[in-house]
């Protein structure tokens, strides 16, 4: 099974569709998704809430049957896919502010609050734009936020296969992640550039995890 995540930055063109198809993913954990996005052959479920008109916080797309579930948090989509729960999330960035869907006085406390809600939903696969490096130096994330995410993963029995994946920026590590059960066997983890034909499709690259 191949699981991918990509922050679309609220854009959708034929090039975006091409890159999505090139990932050959069975399960897509998308963030900053226009609600007009449709991918032939894939079922898709969006968050109820919008970042701004026409742009949803997150979505889940899959070639398998999908049963939408209520959002456990305003910036997280949740669905049941082939009997297990899948979540796709945006977690707070440094200057996200405290307006809904965030709750807290800074990035760390807002992340902790979001993770608590997501953890309660019990996803078996969880990913998206977490705005935190999980290993190495913190450029985008916070210490408290990282600790909350890692604690949530441990509680759920998950491991972020992307924790050491490179960011597009030299020397930095990914803030986009895919977490799966710690006992699953990972065949490969790859970053896929979102710069196609010298055109930046998004300010985030895509990542996929291949599971045996």
What residue ranges belong to the model's regions?
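Ligand-binding grooves and catalytic loops that recognize ribose/phosphate and carbohydrate rings
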Residues: 34-75
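N-terminal, active-site-proximal structural segment of metallo-dependent hydrolase catalytic domains
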Residues: 1-42, 50-52
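Active-site regions of metal-assisted phosphoester/phosphodiester hydrolases
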Residues: 1-5, 9-17, 27, 58-212
